[in-house]
Amino acid sequence: MSFSDQNLIWIDLEMTGLDPEMHKIIEMATIVTDSELNILAEGPVIAIHQPESELAKMDEWCTTTHTASGLVARVRQSQVSEEEAIDQTLAFLKQWVPEGKSPICGNSIGQDRRFLYKHMPRLEAYFHYRYIDVSTIKELTRRWQPEVLKEFSKTGSHLALDDIRESIAELQFYRKAVFKI
């Protein structure tokens, strides 16, 4: 184990939609890496129970995607509440990173943070206010070095743990291909 204020917390959420005022979190996962993007530990992967009334708010894309991945079935079977998911995740993170030190890391992570702020403020408060958003680097690369993007592709399973692993791999790719580090 390597507890450090230099470790990075990666998080991904799957939600019933894109509006935190209307939709809910249905899955979350975390990974901790060191500052060199080496995976140190994978946190709990949690399907969060939501009532049918919340699942009914999903649009066609969410319903199709989350049903095909098996996530909807896992959410229906889950007994884990949002508060329990927070407690499990914080117990994991506290082993690896002090509170307030790691930026929140991921792809389009601002969207995840909006949901955390609304539905899981205790967990959101554990992160530093800064972001490491891989999608920002992707958008800059698309504009400044578009040929580089042809060298990397993602599967896009829309399962939280898989998405985090892909985000880390994507940042490792940009580190070598764009930043030449």
Swiss-Prot record:
SMART domains: EXOIII
GO cellular component term, pick one: cytoplasm
E.C. designation(s): 3.1.15.-
Record localization: Cytoplasm
InterPro entries, per the entry: Exonuclease_RNaseT/DNA_pol3 (IPR013520), Oligoribonuclease (IPR022894), RNaseH-like_sf (IPR012337), RNaseH_sf (IPR036397)
Listed transmembrane segments: none
Chief place where the protein resides: cytoplasm
Record: active site: Y129
GO MF term list: 3'-5'-RNA exonuclease activity; nucleic acid binding
Main EC class the enzyme belongs to: hydrolase
Keyword vocabulary terms for this entry: Cytoplasm, Exonuclease, Hydrolase, Nuclease
Gene Ontology BP, a term: DNA metabolic process
Entry-linked Gene3D superfamilies: Ribonuclease H-like superfamily/Ribonuclease H (3.30.420.10)
Pfam families: RNase_T (PF00929)
Residue ranges of domain Exonuclease in the record: 8-171
Family membership noted in the UniProt record: Belongs to the oligoribonuclease family.
Function per UniProt: 3'-to-5' exoribonuclease specific for small oligoribonucleotides.
Listed HAMAP family: Oligoribonuclease
Name by which UniProt lists this protein: Oligoribonuclease
Species of origin: Vibrio cholerae serotype O1 (strain ATCC 39315 / El Tor Inaba N16961)
